[in-house]
Amino acid sequence: MASQGTKRSYEQMETGGERQNATEIRASVGRMVGGIGRFYIQMCTELKLSDYEGRLIQNSITIERMVLSAFDERRNKYLEEHPSAGKDPKKTGGPIYRRRDGKWMRELILYDKEEIRRIWRQANNGEDATAGLTHLMIWHSNLNDATYQRTRALVRTGMDPRMCSLMQGSTLPRRSGAAGAAVKGVGTMVLELIRMIKRGINDRNFWRGENGRRTRIAYERMCNILKGKFQTAAQRAMMDQVRESRNPGNAEIEDLIFLARSALILRGSVAHKSCLPACVYGLAVASGYDFEREGYSLVGIDPFRLLQNSQVFSLIRPNENPAHKSQLVWMACHSAAFEDLRVSSFIRGTRVVPRGQLSTRGVQIASNENMETMDSSTLELRSRYWAIRTRSGGNTNQQRASAGQISVQPTFSVQRNLPFERATIMAAFTGNTEGRTSDMRTEIIRMMENASPEDVSFQGRGVFELSDEKATNPIVPSFDMSNEGSYFFGDSAEEYDN
């Protein structure tokens, strides 16, 4: 990004810090994940979990969800004001799985939110440590991105299900702050804005009065976040139009859908971070690793290194393939749901298959599933190489306005050319260049037509051996271009339902 000077790195966003140098960033990110680890260890003690049970990813997710719920001010307030049957607004809990006599058992636990908050603060030097909470939210979001499809959400707002590669972070809660905004895809932002505009169309008072003023500020802020993701002047100018509209309506929805489509070729900048389950940080802290002293980065070798030495287990349903379950979690850990499968496969060192070919359902187990038949297995989360995570969208040789990579949103900064049938995409842009944004639309379409599939993204960037922590010898992989690169090809995943 050319505007690098004005942007905080995403570690700074993640840790809520002002501008810091690299060492300070590494230390504050280290402090954040160390706090998560200490909290996890304490919770395992409270719950009397065995070592094996503490390494079970389902238990990790329950504990993460409990602390997120304990700190969800808005929802807590809502629950207190609207008491619903059988829900204690002061308590939080979930399923904990224990190994008893060679079988897995589910136990529903309930804790005071106040108690959970106390344990969390204690693990984080008495602070609220919002950064750590956001980090957990992003891990859950990355897991959802790898597990579920959002076709229904796309269709409901009038978008095309083929735009699924723009939907990173679509399940992140609103309170996820700057770090959350950085990882949201263009489609996610468009979806949120369209929902807002539709409410305004249906509800006369949405933009009016004191509340309406706050709504308007939120609308403009979201527009600015989305504008910041676009890398071409015409796309940004169109966002200004949408933001400045007196009374946002169908014209703005049209513009936003047009922009989302354009992002399939003129990619937005979307950040990628490797956020790992709490139990992984817990294991490292328990083994005596000092994250704050050693420093940590979400976008470098550190998460790969951590996963090389962590053994995490997962419950497996009777007809699921453990290797496929591992792939799902590996992709979530590296925020690689939207990455080109050929790049992921090369880095992982084993073939990564499209979601339609996976014999596995989500990681979480529903409360009505039968535990009698549950087994568990080790998740294989190691990798053959590591690569730097990107925030650029993969536009070629630093031309801001060239093609990014279609049908994927690159996660790793690794050279590849662009597997796309431009004709297929351009077909989505039939006709409509009228209206007040016509010149911008024409300009955007022209740029898209000039994008060529032979272009190379991330020129000269490669992957690195795991022994090469300073990233000195890039290995530039060559890919078989005939393969379909999208994970969503032949999709058969379940829909995400809140």
UniProtKB/Swiss-Prot annotation:
**The gene coding this protein:** NP
Under InterPro entries, the record lists: Flu_NP (IPR002141)
Reported function: Encapsidates the negative strand viral RNA, protecting it from nucleases. The encapsidated genomic RNA is termed the ribonucleoprotein (RNP) and serves as template for transcription and replication. The RNP needs to be localized in the host nucleus to start an infectious cycle, but is too large to diffuse through the nuclear pore complex. NP comprises at least 2 nuclear localization signals that are responsible for the active RNP import into the nucleus through cellular importin alpha/beta pathway.
Q: Which GO terms are recorded in the biological process aspect for this UniProt protein? A: symbiont entry into host cell; viral penetration into host nucleus
Keyword RNA-binding tagged: yes
Q: Identify the stretch annotated as signal peptide in this record.
A: none
Chain intervals for the UniProt region annotation (Disordered) = 1-21
Q: How is it modified after translation?
A: Late in virus-infected cells, may be cleaved from a 56-kDa protein to a 53-kDa protein by a cellular caspase. This cleavage might be a marker for the onset of apoptosis in infected cells or have a specific function in virus host interaction.
Organism for this UniProt entry: Influenza A virus (strain A/Ruddy Turnstone/New Jersey/47/1985 H4N6)
Query: Where does the UniProt annotation locate this protein?
Result: Virion; Host nucleus
Description of how the protein assembles with itself and partners: Homomultimerizes to form the nucleocapsid. May bind host exportin-1/XPO1. Binds to viral genomic RNA. Protein-RNA contacts are mediated by a combination of electrostatic interactions between positively charged residues and the phosphate backbone and planar interactions between aromatic side chains and bases.
Q: What is this protein called?
A: Nucleoprotein
> Is Ribonucleoprotein among this UniProt entry's keywords?
yes
